[in-house]
Amino acid sequence: MKRVFINGYGSIGSRLAQFIKDDPEITVVGVGKYSPDDKVQDAISRGFDVYVPEKKIDSFKNYKIKGTIESAVASSDLVVDAAPGGTGYVNKKQLYEPKNVMAIYQGGESVFGDERVSDLLFNSRVNYKEAFGKRHVMQGSCNVTGMGRILQPLREKYGSQIIRFDGILVRRWADLEQTEKTVPDTIEWTPNPHHGDDVKFYMGEKTPLFLQVIKVPTRQMHLHIMNIRFKDVAPKPDEILDLFKNEYGVATLWTAKGTKQIRDAAESMKFSFKDTNMIHIHANMLECIGDTVKMMYSDDQTGIVIPENHILMQAMLFQKPYEEAFAHTESLFHMAEKKRLLEEYFAKKV
């Protein structure tokens, strides 16, 4: 039995804690909280011990706090750093390394520059075994994770037949729970986005990926518009869809009209947190014209990295074989059943 501490209880931390508490191979030490808000009582009501920074403990006197984050880290085998983005490097240097504890970092951190948290950016579809023996690993962001689920199967099947990937990432403005963030009436563009460099970090620096990124006023998922250019005539749509038919965490939807409709369907089917935890290829938007495949897929920004974190834990803590790790994650997340339900709900009209 391994002891895991979730350092942070936001969009990622709250979800991950809820799922891995049912893992018979893991004991959840507790969750870390940095602000004395309603989420503290939420965590306690769900049965989690709450730990806070030693220097802030007086701010939490109205709550039943278990102890300090420093003590929780010291008693753990692995920490999932789900603290506010950009604090991972400081936590690594001040908390995790001094206490010789393994750590997983989230997509708000970096694998570049002086404050890189790791030399490995994890994507279970690409580099699962490379996490064996690693002490510090960064889990890719929702967009970066999603691109791996699409690009890697294409690369495996078509290889050098593919000349380039050209993508437009349409990012959501804020997550569902981030009610403190206003969603303004504007569209923003992102110069020099990190997403392309992150994908190339795990797929290889010569990956011919070229991205443009915009942010739009919605809380309902990301959308990727991906054009794949081939040396010769592009494959037919049916061939592309067949490639993803049995792909883990990728659903093919025919009749969805928007991202909120997918989220609403997930809620109606009682999916935890209204998350699908996957990529959704919008089959009615798939075109093959000349040498180019034009596809569009939505990315469940709050849910897609949660099973990825769990798979990464198994690589770091147990060095499990790939198939065994995925089967264990499936036993908690039921991704195959969610995929089946979504594909039936948004099936092609006959």
Residues covered by each model-derived region:
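Solvent-exposed amphipathic alpha-helical surface segments
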Residues: 23, 157, 251, 316-323
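Active-site catalytic microenvironments for nucleophilic, acid-base chemistry
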Residues: 153-157, 229, 315
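NAD(P)-dependent Rossmann-like dehydrogenase/reductase catalytic/cofactor-binding core
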Residues: 274-350
